[in-house]
Amino acid sequence: MNRKLIFPLALALCLAQAQTTGQFALTIDNIMRGPGLVGYEPAQPRWSYDSQHIYFQWKQYTDKEDAPMDTYAANRDGSGLRKLSDAEVRQLPAATGDTGKDKRRFVYASSDDLYVLDNTTGKIQQLTKTTEVEANPHFLPDSKRIWFTRGGNVYVMSLDSGMLVQMSDIVPAAPANAPATAAGGRGGGRGQGQGQGGGRGQGGRGGAADQAASSASQTYLKNEQKELIEAVRERVAAKDEAEAKRKALAQRKPFNLTGTQTVRELQLSPDEKYVFAAVAEPGTAKPTVVPNYISDTGYVEDINGRSNVGDSQATTRIAILNTDSGEVTWVDHGQRIPHTNDSDGAAPARAPASQDRDLQLGMPVWSDDGAKAVIAGRSADSKDRWIFALDPATGKTRELAHDHDNAWIGGPAANTLGWMKNDREVYFQSERSGYAHLYAAPFDAGDARALTSGNWEVLNVRQSRDRSKFYLTASKEGPFDQFFYEMSGDGGPLTRIAGEPGKHSVTVSPDERSIADLYSYTNKPTELYVRENQLQSAATKVTTSPAPEFSQYKWLDAPIVMVPARDGVKVPARLFKPANFKKGGPGAIFVHGAGYLQNVDHKWSSYYHEYMFDHILMARGFTVIDVDYRGSAGYGRDWRTAVYEHMGGKDLDDIVDAAKYLAAEQGVDPKKIGLWGGSYGGFITLMAMFTQPDVFTAGGALRPVSDWANRKARRSP
């Protein structure tokens, strides 16, 4: 058999004759125009404070790819689309910030300063204008004060008086090459060492012996003055009293970071008693260095990339700082080594040991009344995830929920965590049933209960403003569509709001009467729509992104077929069959990358170049199939983890079975089947060509993964 390994397969096909429908020429050059053909997707939609306007990022298909996105605005009903000027953009509130419990004001950071928006008048007030970076503002429960971070510490500001209170004193670790501090400490002035330039510190100008003698005589003279002169005694007493008061007010101990410690995140508790600091310790991992030969300087420059798998990674602990005393308590997650039992999927029992297990802890999530806190923790090996109740006073935790997976914890919305309206339960996402669903766990005691269930996935979730209901995007109707739903805040049936087949990514307006919907379909790129937030409401299209000639071609709404696998499983695939199909023609299989990604569905694919290339292949007589092999997203936990510790196993089997399906069911010549893919798809292509040479005649491995020792650290499987 004549077999050829071609990198890439596209090179053998780039001479395809132009196929036209209307005025569009189906050529390699045309489909590789990228956004110049399919347009730039609108992104990051957000509503105005009064829900009357929608803002989003977008560019015209004629804009250069390296040009920044522009900010556009439209009215609530989708009319009045226009690009905002730079001056108008500067007047917009930031996309992220915090709203007070009274819903009256919105505080945010912009250009390293703080601003507050009055939701009743629309007026914006600048709160800070400094050379320091103010960030992460949040309202306190009284809605009159905010806390924020500046210079690695937490501050509280009154919006009425402007009074500023520092809530923590976190001192960064000194650089490793910093000079030693003079004996005089912070008061050492400009002096260095014991005998030179002591300034106002204790260093003095003379040597150690001279300083000692001078100090003794000065002390005698000072005491004599106090004994002989009453005015001096009174001044000294007043000074001592003032110093005592100052020390009483400044009794908070500093939290001195040591060595290579850094603070990644800060948070103030609602009662203002504690500051939480995520303290990171870097591991011994070395970055992958990539040479940049084309630089602005004309010299070769190093680009530090990610570290490799197996390297020691950074660890993070949560410190609890008492805002009055400065005393530090560390969160104790209670998980010790050993903690292993991989015999089945059940949660392993914890065995006592002296060494803490390495957990990555999140920051506390507080109940609405500010009285209770929970945190999430994930083991470094990603096999376990916990939800803990936290006692801020002691740092002790109590387990509320625990998930264990012999492969790795994952799935959509895996980091979801919040409080139910009753403030007695927390909601979270879990694949414990085999599919990603929403659960509620009681804070005090008891087992978690399922809020959603079935052989489908909840892809993302958020609460309504009054927490009376959930808004969800889910695949309830089947794995190939993502619809937008609402559900009672206590669980129950789902009501479908945005229901056209395809993918819906929804942003709800502040008044919750309207939604902005980023919607796409198999042969329709993502566009922005607006609609009322009610059952089966009609959508109004706001944007048109592709070049006009894109719509001149009849892009295929590729049917989804089920490929029978050797173990009895049905593997989803998209089929591209030429209109002029002749039995015995060639076949091709596209293998998507990323591994954990879904490419067989009714949305516009992120692999749109490959989607259009499938049309070129069809025009040349190829029957093409795209496969969501084992390890792909969208089909539950077991599908996701089926390749654990054996990449190139079941995933490759699915590709081989797809080739057999093309021959047996679609009339393709089994001796004329090739495959191609990039990244993980390139890896599968290499595995196929080297281990299945009797199945595949040609292969194109683009940017392939060829050595798993070089994969990204903490990347599962």
Write out the residue ranges for each language-model feature:
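Beta-propeller folds
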Residues: 7-8, 12-514, 520-531, 535-537, ...
